[in-house]
Design a protein with these regions (language model features):
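Non-catalytic, polymerase-adjacent accessory regions of viral genome-replication enzymes
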Residues: 1-46
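Active-site-proximal segment of RNA-dependent polymerases
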Residues: 7, 90-144
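Short, compositionally biased low-complexity segments
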Residues: 11-26, 59-64, 91-96, 126
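Short, conserved non-catalytic motifs in the polymerase core
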Residues: 27-35, 60-87, 100-112, 172-209
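Active-site-flanking structural segment that lines cofactor/substrate pockets
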Residues: 41-72
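Conserved polymerase palm-domain catalytic core
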Residues: 44, 51, 104, 123-218
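Generic hydrophobic/packing signal
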Residues: 52, 56, 69-71, 81, ...
């Protein structure tokens, strides 16, 4: 795959930021923080654009809560202005990266989803005697930041875009992972390694797929 470059102009384009703001407020339009942002929408977006251009953008703190159904999960809600940035980034990187996905990647992809995955599974099940069902325990809390960044650098060469991705990843709040490491896992010492992406971010829904696909391709 040819690495993606020159993504930054699309990300910081004002029209893309407007589009991202509309995407981020879907289903949340009348919440106080969204109303406050939209009251001075142009000024807020221009400020975001300036911060991105000058590399002074810093993600804000997360609001966290826990859900228990179907199992206990820590949900992290980013500030609204950060969600606008997430959409602006994904508008630029998702379409080209999506084209590199294998056909059986169904999560968070337009035109795919659970129904298509189920249909595909039924086809496999009818032609096979054995089925392996498995899950990755604590997947989001266990995602290694350094490994994720290294994989993304195989796919993206635009330095400005990588700066923003790193900023978002580094801004992740603690996810309460169990801190397990394996023999030979010596990229960094356990104390220095940072792991975990917040469940709730748009970027957290898409970026981990790159790890899954890379693992399959390896």
């Amino acid at each position: 795959m040819k690495r993606l470059g020159n993504l930054w102009p699309q990300i910081i384009d004002f029209d893309n930021l407007i589009c991202a703001a509309h995407q981020a407020q879907q289903g949340k339009r009348y919440r106080p923080n969204v109303l406050a942002f939209n009251y001075n929408l142009d000024q807020e977006l221009l400020r975001l654009q300036r911060e991105l251009t000058e590399k002074t953008y810093r993600p804000g703190g997360y609001r966290t809560f826990r859900i228990e159904d179907p199992k206990s999960r820590l949900i992290s809600a980013a500030p609204y202005r950060d969600r606008v940035v997430h959409h602006a980034l994904c508008n630029a990187i998702v379409p080209p990266l999506d084209r590199t996905m294998i056909a059986d990647t169904y999560a968070n992809r337009t035109g795919y989803g659970t129904h298509q995955a189920l249909k595909r599974f039924v086809g496999f099940a009818r032609s096979s005697r054995y089925v392996l069902q498995c899950d990755i325990r604590q997947y989001f809390p266990s995602i290694d930041h350094a490994i994720l960044k290294a994989i993304l650098r195989r796919k993206i060469k635009c330095r400005d875009t990588l700066w923003l991705i790193d900023r978002i990843i580094d801004g992740s709040n603690p996810q309460g992972g169990d801190g397990e490491y394996f023999l030979g896992d010596e990229l960094l010492t356990p104390i220095e390694r940072r792991r975990g992406l917040p469940i709730g971010n748009l970027t957290s829904q898409f970026l981990p797929i790159c790890i899954s696909v890379a693992s399959i391709m390896l």
